[in-house]
Amino acid sequence: MEKFVEKMLGQALRQYGRNVAIDPLSPYEKQSLKAALQERRNEEPDEDLHAHIEDIIYDYVTNQGLFS
């Protein structure tokens, strides 16, 4: 499941111009994004994984929420 989540995070980041194949996430970034995802899933368990990932990446790219 972890590799799947990392792949989804990479695909979501690509929409904002970051290619993780060329510019990979640091271990700290991965940990922060996964922690934010877990928190979001706990807060809104009925929301699907894709929506959570899109929200987390948007917050990350725009320095909002947990990333501000």
From Swiss-Prot:
It holds the Pfam family YqzH. This is Uncharacterized protein YqzH. It comes from Bacillus subtilis (strain 168).
